[in-house]
Amino acid sequence: MDFGRSRDIISGLPDSLLCHILSFLNTKEAASTSVLAKKWRYLFASVPNLDFDDSVHLRLGKRNPAVSGEDYLKMINERSDQLSTSFMDFVDQVLRLQDNSPLHKFSLKIRDCVDIVRIICWILKVLERGVSDLELDMHLKWKSSLPSKIFLSETLVRLKLSVERGPFIDVEDVHLPKLKTLHIVSVKFEKHGIGLNKLLSGCHILEELNLEYISWCLWDFVSVSLTTLKRLTFCGEVMQDENPISVSFNTPNLVYLMFTDAIADEYSTVNFDSLVEAHINLQMSEDQVEQTRFSDSEGNMEGCMVANATELIMGICNVKILYLSVYTLEVLTYCCEAIPLFNNLTHLTIESNSEVGWESVSGLLKNSPNLETLVFKGLVHRFTDKCGDMCLCKPWEEDEEEEEDEETPTCLSSCPVKVLKILEFGKIYDDEIEKRIDQVKHFLEKIPDIEQLILHYNTPVDEDVIKVYQQLRRHPKVASSKCKLQLISDNLSLSSKDCALFGID
């Protein structure tokens, strides 16, 4: 082999492989390869993925310190117009070069002034070429509706529309026979809930649906009814003083739910029969929160229902994996008639902060008979006398007789949890860390079958980590002799491995 001569090894690769490699580059980078040789120009014309992002083109460069005031603003506007025109010409040129070759993905991200007429032409062009993955992320002023042909595509498999301040969806006919994934972000529907229903009715094999930051608090109703749906992200634009009127779900084959919304006035239908994993962030309005605070101050929390989310909570009771935000804990306390039985639940994650108490946590644990892993994202919670026996702010700890009675039953003593994880334990060693250590000890004293405690301590101070580790490891009063400790920090990971914990050799 002659190593003295340079060889163009890459150009010798098969054209199909080169096109595949180019498809991973953004379109500006891929287009730059066309100047290498005539072969590369033809290769670029066959690239199946096009990714246009005006932020890549609209870079103004460094500011000239000699130019300021109105002259600088004028220069910026002129330069911005030039770059915008350059971007539009580039997109036109690429689409013209590719002509009618097959197209897999077309992604368009726009944050600046681009001619809407040209945008529509680009969309129609790629639809004519049979694009299967269309992503439009546009933040610009566009008063009309999106092109109706988007919703009459025989080839689209994935569609993502994020058009903040942009066009709205107004469809009379929807025919998307191959669409499996639909993302709708910050989009306005001309006919509100009716418009959404119309859109979904034309997606006969849809499996994944993302509805994010849509103002359905202003709608008469919002409904998702799809028997083919498997994954749903339902994220409302939560308003401080508004609640949705009516929300319903008929999704019997759904297995994954990500839910963020204010409590609706009613949940007329909730069908999550196949649900396996749910992330729930359900929130009260400001007025509802104020009502709960007033009830607490008056000592009248019992029976105080400021809203009713019972039907929604009942609908998720079949899950195996459940993530609850701190606001959802509050909803379970003040907006749920009773906590249902979570018979299938094996993994529960609870978020906590100083503004919300643990009143509902005790009921959750009592009604989760098969729970194996319990995760707390933070241990700090609002001090109250209504946390029950979950924590150390329980009112009966001041009663010496009950404190001395080791047989006092607690929700923890019947808790089947084997793995306890504490995330965001703290950052610096102070009095608050001591309180959290006491809370962890309380868990260890009461949970009978715990086999592993994993604690994440967000500190770079190794001495503090060792101090916490030793306190927990040497704690003598532990319900389970099988429990192993692992403490993870920024720099360290300490583990008792196979050795028995807390003074047991």
Swiss-Prot record:
CDD domains: F-box_AtFBL13-like. Residues 7-55 form the F-box domain. InterPro entries: F-box-like_dom_sf (IPR036047), F-box_AtFBL13-like (IPR053781), F-box_dom (IPR001810), FBD (IPR006566), FBL60-like (IPR055294), LRR_dom_sf (IPR032675), LRR_FXL15/At3g58940/PEG3-like (IPR055411). Pfam families: F-box (PF00646), LRR_At5g56370 (PF24758). PANTHER family: RNI-LIKE SUPERFAMILY PROTEIN (PTHR31293:SF16). This is Putative F-box protein At1g58310. It comes from Arabidopsis thaliana.
